[in-house]
UniProtKB/Swiss-Prot annotation:
Species lineage: Eukaryota, Fungi, Dikarya, Ascomycota, Saccharomycotina
Glycosylation sites: N97, N162, N192, N250, N315, N356, N390, N439, N445, N461
Species: Saccharomyces cerevisiae (strain ATCC 204508 / S288c) (Baker's yeast)
Protein name per Swiss-Prot or TrEMBL: Acid phosphatase PHO11
Signal peptide: 1-17
Catalysed transformations (reactions): a phosphate monoester + H2O = an alcohol + phosphate
Induction of the gene: S.cerevisiae has 2 types of acid phosphatase: one is constitutive and the other is repressible by inorganic phosphate.
Family designation: Belongs to the histidine acid phosphatase family.
Active-site feature positions: H75 (nucleophile), D338 (proton donor)
Designated gene of the protein: PHO11
Miscellaneous section: Present with 1460 molecules/cell in log phase SD medium.
Length: 467
């Protein structure tokens, strides 16, 4: 009911959408000026490099030779999901029907403001040059993927110089598929690339990039009792401040929370968002930690199912590493969702699982997990296998930064010696059982991830889903 009502509201506001210019001249001075808040948007905003790079060079250590590269990437910048858009449009309706003159932080709404969701067909979808609110927007998912492709060629181009035909893998989410295709486009026309579209339906079982979708035991509300302890009074403070500046507006804590999503997704679509300017720095910090907390306990180390779910992809990754000498394909590129990447990183052990996050306060000294550092829109996790003299090593590069394995980083470039890595990986997956923990057999007969090995005969081409 709400969905229909909100869509009706939006439709009415879009009657003259065809006459709306793609941005205004005044936008030029604002676009690209809000990068400092990206780390506080919980991964909903544009891509940025991992801040904790430890000063380690991204370059291949001297006198070493790359043997294999794997990448698991998140789709690029997008419009909000349908469910998130409901909240944003409900709050927009409240603002658009305010009869007074806006004052204070909301005064920009007096200046012929154009709501950034101009067509509901864009919900769930990648932002592109065609659907962006402003043609000058530098943060579209389309351009991010193409930049990523150019960065890939600069860093690893020699790995595909003599391999003109290879596969790229994506979940059958429309936005993931679009990201993969834009990435392929960014590589240029030198390569003959086969895009394999892998189902993320629960019936895919283990043969998927999105194992949590194949997990009937997955609980979206797990650990809510912990999360409810987090102090969210700052949200009512935002609402009260804006209401005081604008008598009769009657914003709620829910509206205040929605403004953070509005801020992030408007930047994705427009290149900047005046809504972002309503927050104090303290409020951004409190919101950001709330996102860290929710992620840690619902898609990260704080949820005991996650390590088994992430093992589905991690086991396949380790198998590819072991077969690097016999596999013709030396580069393995995949695109999926943030949840899948977080599950994967949890199993690897890159995300600290020894110290649970507290909901009692913001732990500035002890908090080593920041959701947006790992999974901004367009996130990418690279696994590098390289040989130096007679020894071989593995290391991870997350969003442009080398992130060492804490207990295995004595190799060149803070890498992990290959046999030590295999021992480490075995310990990480010990006790995990994706099929059993998730009760996969109740929804699928597929018990193994095989698409990396059988794509050339099966030719995966699942129907795209708008999610």
């Amino acid at each position: 009911m709400l969905k229909s009502a909100v869509y009706s509201i939006l439709a009415a506001s879009l009657v003259n959408a065809g006459t709306i210019p793609l941005g205004k001249l005044s936008d030029i001075d604002k676009i690209g000026t809000q990068t400092e808040i990206f780390p506080f948007l919980g991964g909903s905003g544009p891509y940025y490099s991992f801040p904790g790079d430890y000063g380690i060079s991204r370059d291949l250590p001297e006198s070493c030779e790359m043997k294999q590269v794997q990448m698991v990437g998140r789709h690029g910048e997008r419009y909000p999901t349908v469910s998130k858009a409901k909240s944003i449009m409900t709050t927009w309706y409240k603002l658009s029907n305010y009869t007074g003159q806006f004052s204070g932080a909301l005064s920009f709404l007096n200046d012929d403001y154009e709501f950034f969701i101009r067509d509901t067909k864009n919900l769930e979808m990648e932002t592109t040059l065609a659907n962006s609110v402003n043609v000058l927007n530098p943060y579209t998912g389309e351009m991010n993927a193409k930049r990523h492709a150019r960065d890939f060629l600069a860093q690893y181009g020699y790995m595909v110089e003599n391999q003109t035909s290879f596969a790229v893998f994506t979940s059958n989410s429309n936005r993931c598929h679009d990201t993969a295709q834009y990435f392929i486009d960014g590589l240029g026309d030198k390569f003959n690339i086969s895009l394999q579209t892998i189902s993320e339906a629960e019936s895919a079982g283990a043969n998927t990039l999105s194992a949590h979708h194949s997990c009937p035991a997955w609980d979206d509300d797990v650990n809510d009792d912990i999360l409810k302890k987090y102090d969210t009074k700052y949200l009512s403070g935002i609402a009260k401040r804006l209401n005081k500046e604008n008598k009769g507006l009657n914003l709620t804590s829910s509206d205040a929370n929605t403004f953070f999503a509005w801020c992030a997704y408007e930047i994705n679509a427009r290149g900047y968002s005046d809504i972002c300017n309503i927050f104090t720095k303290d409020e951004l910090v409190r919101f950001s930690y709330g996102q860290d907390l929710e992620t840690y306990y619902q898609t990260g180390p704080g949820y005991d199912v996650v390590r088994s779910v992430g093992a589905n992809l991690f086991n396949a990754s380790v198998k590819l590493l072991k077969e690097s000498e016999v596999q013709d394909q030396k580069v393995w590129l995949s695109f999926t969702h943030d949840t899948d990447i977080l599950n994967y990183l949890t199993t690897i052990g890159i995300i600290d699982d020894k110290n649970n996050l507290t909901a009692e306060h913001v732990p500035f000294m002890e908090n080593t997990f920041h959701r947006s550092w790992y999974v901004p829109q367009g996130a990418r996790v690279y696994t590098e296998k390289f040989q130096c003299s007679n020894d071989t090593y593995v290391r991870y590069v997350i969003n442009d930064a080398v992130v060492p394995i804490e207990t295995c980083s004595t190799g060149p470039g803070f890498s992990c010696e290959i046999n030590d890595f295999y021992d480490y990986a075995e310990k990480r997956v010990a006790g995990t059982d994706f099929l059993k923990v998730c009760n996969v057999s109740s929804v699928s007969n597929s018990t193994e991830l095989t698409f990396f090995w059988d794509w050339n005969t099966k030719h995966y081409n699942d129907t795209l889903l708008k999610q």
